[in-house]
């Protein structure tokens, strides 16, 4: 990674059109004038040095990313020392745990705001600060649309959580404790105590939830410095990584290496392979598709199918045992990518922000901790990729095979002669309010041969698509020790959940997808061997039910929700704003003057 300031090829950066434009000296004066009120000099802005934006996602309302309020000074130091001029600006907040009705609304909203900032202001390159789930794809989508040099800096996971000498992972402990509470095994106070124990420091989720998955994806795509994703937020290496990232973005600005130079089809295939091997979040599916679409790359169901046979080699909750600190010490994402490279499951010749190929970045990155990162041919589990399903209820859905536990496998997938095939009676809920109201209703007669179905949870129905598919069984089953039932829905589930749900079903119920005509009591047949999921309902009955119309969804509550509902795609195509994907390489043309 280059650090010397000499040997750089001089460039006229786009910011010069604002700050040093001899054809419009009056406009130059206007643009310069107000920046001086906080002490920056006109000589700095007219020096020809690149203006490096720092897209600040940290705030008090975004606690997973709040570490960036401290890290930003090290980013600034790196930029200054490498010969750039830093300019920090705020990004629309995204916080999965707290945002109602769902933070899925915020990914595209953050994307829109960031596109306007990067395109309309004198920014030559950008450091994308990331952490919580959707901050990573939102930033990458925007930087790709504008297509200025960009680099991703994760804030890193929290330290490992401990409760009574037991590792407790953020998010995952919520779903597991919720079941224990319903079964009468713990009190409400113990529930809160376990949850608090899982969050001992600054940082994002310390499990292999969506946050850790997407920051590892940024590395697999080649958009982060090697080893960036997994460094825990409080570690000294995190500040050092922030400094190095600040340095490197200046080199990228001079070299004019842009996202579209890096984000090839092969780069996205690398990301998909990484998600499988790490037991990553199912939310990676719409996010990877969305990033790819904004890069002009098509990712289809076949790309996910191609990675299905990749084994689970990362022993990290929710699919495994350990948490973020141990994963970092075991080598993090580079060690996982190294394993994939050795087996020919990674494109090693792709370009990355280091200026080197992926193969060059991974030299010497083999793990020394085989309790955390298993050998490829001695994995934690076989076939850990997302299982893609289709049938008369939807054209596309996925199932996270890496979290299929022994209890679930024995009960549903081990019938002699019918391994991997099961039938279940559908219990249909219209949204999570309906689920919470009726799940313990004795009239439903829910037993272990039922499948819980939730609809109205997709991009249009919710709106935004909600993490509600990982429904737990009714209390009477939990008290019998039955901790999970098959679940299905047109929404999503938390990446920290350990439920082998069928989710992201597209098209969703709210636009007439097959779940809209499903009824409680119908039999659903699921064949994991062929990737089929069908309701055993005859065509005449289906046609008659369709005449009843689509189940009602909640009213739109905000202007943005109205815009979102009018333009968002389905989860199989990334949940993007369909009108936005046609806008690419915006920085190739400067915006017109404002006066």
Swiss-Prot record:
**According to its UniProt record, what is one Pfam family this protein matches?**
ILV_EDD_C
Would the keyword Methyltransferase be found if you checked this record's keyword annotation? no
Keywords for this entry? 2Fe-2S, Carbohydrate metabolism, Iron, Iron-sulfur, Lyase, Magnesium, Metal-binding, Xylose metabolism
Residues binding Mg(2+) are 96, 133, 467
Q: Which SUPFAM superfamilies match?
A: IlvD/EDD N-terminal domain-like, LeuD/IlvD-like
| Reactions this protein catalyses | D-xylonate = 2-dehydro-3-deoxy-D-arabinonate + H2O; D-gluconate = 2-dehydro-3-deoxy-D-gluconate + H2O
- How activity varies with pH? Optimum pH is 8.5.
Catalytic activity, EC: 4.2.1.82, 4.2.1.39
Gene Ontology MF term list:
2 iron, 2 sulfur cluster binding; gluconate dehydratase activity; metal ion binding; xylonate dehydratase activity
Question: Which residues does the record give as [2Fe-2S] cluster binding sites?
Answer: 64, 132, 205
Which GO biological-process labels does this protein carry? Answer: carboxylic acid metabolic process; D-xylose catabolic process
Read off the PROSITE patterns from this record.
Answer: ILVD_EDD_1
Query: Which pathway does the UniProt entry assign to this protein?
Result: Carbohydrate metabolism; D-xylose degradation
Cofactor(s) listed? [2Fe-2S] cluster; Mg(2+)
Top-level taxon of the source organism: Bacteria
- What follows loss of this gene? Deletion mutant cannot grow with D-xylose as the sole carbon source.
Its quaternary structure?
A: Homotetramer.
Q: Which family does it belong to?
A: Belongs to the IlvD/Edd family.
NCBIfam families from the entry?
A: PRK06131.1, PRK13017.1
Functional note: Catalyzes the dehydration of D-xylonate to 2-dehydro-3-deoxy-D-arabinonate during D-xylose degradation. Can also dehydrate D-gluconate, with similar catalytic efficiency. Has weak activity with D-galactonate, D-fuconate and L-arabinonate.
Q: What is this protein called?
A: D-xylonate dehydratase
Q: What is the organism of origin for this protein?
A: Caulobacter vibrioides (strain ATCC 19089 / CIP 103742 / CB 15)
Q: What is the lineage of its organism?
A: Bacteria, Pseudomonadati, Pseudomonadota, Alphaproteobacteria, Caulobacterales
